[in-house]
Amino acid sequence: MISSPSTPATFAAGSLVLLCLVLGGGHFALAQKEGNDDIQHYTADDCQVTPVIHVLQYPGCVPKPIPSFACVGRCASYIQVSGSKIWQMERSCMCCQESGEREASVSLFCPKAKNGEKKFKKVSTKAPLECMCRPCTGIEDANVIPQELAAFADDGTLTSYFQKGQLRNSE
């Protein structure tokens, strides 16, 4: 189930739901769980344009701090067993990313400029115009480690079922 950024996702209490941590700009964010025992709502979308100081650097020039913007926040992500095909997983990994960009030109002072070169270097920089939760880079199925290999599996009903199924196939 994928929800729009303004609508919280809703999962039945019996659903297997694992939330992935989103790393963005050095911040870790995990969705907050709200609701009663029957229905759980995960509301985590909080992706905003944030003012930052960006230091522009160019070889031979004096670094120049300038006011800029960055996308900072958290977005809801999950992995769950498919409702229609219980042998498959449904994933939704969302990341706080730019939606449009602005460009600016800045002059840097370059005291080590050689003869004939200008003492000021004009450089271009970009910053996000707006930010929103968008799908992260796709995950290759080959990169997903099964729970049994990652040592996270418990002795639940499904784990026992799959182990028995593997034994029957190997006989």
UniProtKB/Swiss-Prot annotation:
Disulfide bonds join 47-96, 61-110, 71-131, 75-133, 93-136. SMART domains: CT. The keyword Lipoprotein does not apply. Its main location: secreted. GO terms for biological process: animal organ morphogenesis; chitin-based cuticle sclerotization; cuticle pigmentation; sequestering of BMP from receptor via BMP binding. Residues 47-137 form the CTCK domain. Keywords: Disulfide bond, Hormone, Secreted, Signal. InterPro entries: Cys_knot_C (IPR006207), Cystine-knot_cytokine (IPR029034), DAN (IPR004133). PROSITE patterns: CTCK_2. GO terms for molecular function: BMP binding; hormone activity. It is found in: Secreted. GO terms for cellular component: extracellular region; extracellular space. Residues 1-31 form the signal peptide. The bursicon gene is encoded by two loci: burs124 contains exons 1, 2 and 4, and burs3 contains exon 3. Exon 3 is trans-spliced into position in the mature transcript. This unusual gene arrangement has existed for at least the 150 million years (MY) of mosquito evolution since the split of the culicid and anophelid family lineages, but is younger than the 250 MY split of the dipteran suborders Nematocera and Brachycera (containing the Culicidea and Drosophilidae, respectively). Final heterodimeric neurohormone released at the end of the molting cycle, involved in the sclerotization (tanning) of the insect cuticle, melanization and wing spreading. Heterodimer of burs and pburs. This is Bursicon. It comes from Culex pipiens pipiens. The lineage of its organism: Eukaryota, Metazoa, Ecdysozoa, Arthropoda, Hexapoda.
